[in-house]
Design a protein with these regions (language model features):
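Short beta-strand/turn micro-motifs at beta-sheet edges
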Residues: 1-4, 84-88
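Vicinal oxygen chelate
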Residues: 1-5, 11-19, 64-70, 86-186, ...
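A short, N-terminal "cap"/entry segment at the start of jelly-roll beta-barrel domains
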Residues: 2-7, 38-41
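Core segments of cupin and vicinal oxygen chelate
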Residues: 17-73
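Short glycine-/small-residue motifs
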Residues: 73-76, 145-146
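A short, polar/proline- and glycine-enriched secondary-structure boundary/capping micro-motif
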Residues: 85-89, 155-158
Length: 186
């Protein structure tokens, strides 16, 4: 729609919560095949002390990082059991799902791994722009999506980029006047 340069080079990491790190690692490493690349405990003072920089408000939490591909990490904090309720992914401010771009071969392998582990999934579904997806939940109740674009090299942004006219057709359904960024000819 416009030629603005991206703000960043991509996602560094997503940080999610679990109350069972072993169960989480068994799923992400064993079923999905994401390598564990870093394991640490949050240093004292960074959970409840003055040095807290936004970490969960507990001390000595495990904080593990997995290689999600594309130079992106998927991280988990292990929360104390029973301290916090599970969230509702459809609430405002909560994450609805995480989608990973994978090769067609990897897509098929994960599908087989889910079946072997007796885990249900929805798909494959053609979600548009020559992209096929499957949806499933991790053991923490986090909804995941794996998407592939056939044998082609993944080019997610280019494949999903609309023309200005296509985007404006939807944007005009928003209440009120279009924001200046939507009206610009860039």
């Amino acid at each position: 729609m416009n030629n603005a340069r991206p703000l960043s080079r991509g996602v560094h990491h997503l940080a999610l919560n679990t109350d069972d790190m072993k169960m989480t690692l068994d799923f992400y490493v064993g079923v999905l095949g994401m390598p564990l690349v870093h394991a640490l405990k949050v240093p004292p003072g960074l959970g409840t002390g003055p040095g807290n920089r936004g970490n969960p408000p507990f001390e000595n939490l495990r904080h593990y990082f997995l290689d999600a591909g594309g130079d992106t990490l998927l991280a988990f904090f292990e929360m104390p059991k029973g301290v916090k309720p599970k969230g509702d992914r459809d609430c405002i401010g909560n994450m609805q799902h995480v989608s990973f771009a994978v090769s067609e071969q990897r897509f098929s392998q994960v599908r087989k791994n889910l079946e072997k582990a007796n885990l249900s999934y929805l798909g494959p579904i053609n979600v548009g722009c020559d992209t096929w997806s499957m949806y499933f939940y991790d053991p923490n109740g986090i909804r995941l999506e794996f998407s592939h674009q056939g044998e082609a090299e993944p080019c997610v942004v280019e494949r999903w980029r609309q023309t200005r006219a296509e985007a404006l057709q939807e944007l005009t359904t928003l209440n009120g006047e279009l924001a200046s960024w939507a009206q610009s000819s860039r």
